[in-house]
């Protein structure tokens, strides 16, 4: 059996910081605020910078340093078609990333649903790889539940729920009592302060439509 390294292509869900201008200080302050709100979710997480809406020059060295000081790991720049800007980004240590034009691969075969009957306590993490996650109890504040598919919680969601972890935008999050610290589908997330009060402590379903996260109250 060969013991040589092997280089293969793969796909990952990464957070993307979309800049609207060249004001690096504002971008770093925004990112720091998000990290402070959910440090367990964002700390040491990789982030890509999308600069497609930026008209002026960007101080990439300052941007990279600021992102690192905020607690995240800057890995690349997207939305950059200008060769000079690409070179500046590369000189600062960013990878220049482009959207893939190849057809998407067929989704992997889903695993059987993972069922958890006990409460998920603070500090615990449960992950359903290649499948859905069903929790028949509560998810405490400080706990994290993750699934490559959908997440169904029959109790109260007080912690973090991350569905579609490997990029499935059709994933859903359903909970009987919404009090979440964070909900995320395919890398699109809301923190607790982004959830309107009309949905709080209600039976709800989160889904994606047109690359935007939506929430609905369930009447059943």
Curated annotation (Swiss-Prot):
Matches recorded under InterPro entries: CAP/MinC_C (IPR016098), MinC (IPR013033), MinC_C_sf (IPR036145), MinC_N (IPR007874), Septum_form_inhib_MinC_C (IPR005526)
- UniProt key word Cell division: yes
Q: Does the keyword Cell cycle apply?
A: yes
Signal sequence, renumbered to the chain: none
Protein's GO biological process? cell morphogenesis; division septum assembly; regulation of cell division; regulation of cell septum assembly
Q: Gene3D superfamilies, from UniProt?
A: 2.160.20.70, 3.30.70.260
Q: Which UniProt keywords apply?
A: Cell cycle, Cell division, Septation
Query: What is the documented function of this protein?
Result: Cell division inhibitor that blocks the formation of polar Z ring septums. Rapidly oscillates between the poles of the cell to destabilize FtsZ filaments that have formed before they mature into polar Z rings. Prevents FtsZ polymerization.
Write out the similarity annotation: Belongs to the MinC family.
Self-association and partners: Interacts with MinD and FtsZ.
Under NCBIfam families, the record lists:
minC (TIGR01222)
Name used for this protein in its record:
Probable septum site-determining protein MinC
Q: What is the species of this protein?
A: Vibrio atlanticus (strain LGP32)
The encoding gene is minC
């Amino acid at each position: 059996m060969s013991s040589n390294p092997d280089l293969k292509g793969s796909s990952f869900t990464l957070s993307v910081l979309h800049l609207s201008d060249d004001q690096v200080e504002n971008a770093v302050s925004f990112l720091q605020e998000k990290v402070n709100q959910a440090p367990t979710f964002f700390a040491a997480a990789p982030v890509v910078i999308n600069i497609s809406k930026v008209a002026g020059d960007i101080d990439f060295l300052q941007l990279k340093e600021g992102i690192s000081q905020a607690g995240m790991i800057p890995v690349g720049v997207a939305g950059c078609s200008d060769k000079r800007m690409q070179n500046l980004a590369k000189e600062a240590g960013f990878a220049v990333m482009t959207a893939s034009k190849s057809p998407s691969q067929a989704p992997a075969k889903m695993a059987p649903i993972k069922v958890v009957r006990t409460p998920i306590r603070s500090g615990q993490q449960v992950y359903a790889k290649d499948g859905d996650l069903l929790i028949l109890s509560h998810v405490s504040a400080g706990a994290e539940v993750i699934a490559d598919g959908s997440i169904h919680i029959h109790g109260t969601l007080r912690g973090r729920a991350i569905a579609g972890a490997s990029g499935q935008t059709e994933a859903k999050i359903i909970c009987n009592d919404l009090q979440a610290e964070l909900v995320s589908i395919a890398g699109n997330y809301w923190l607790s302060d982004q959830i309107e009060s009309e949905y709080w402590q209600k039976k709800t379903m989160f889904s994606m439509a047109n690359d935007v996260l939506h929430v609905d109250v369930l009447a059943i």
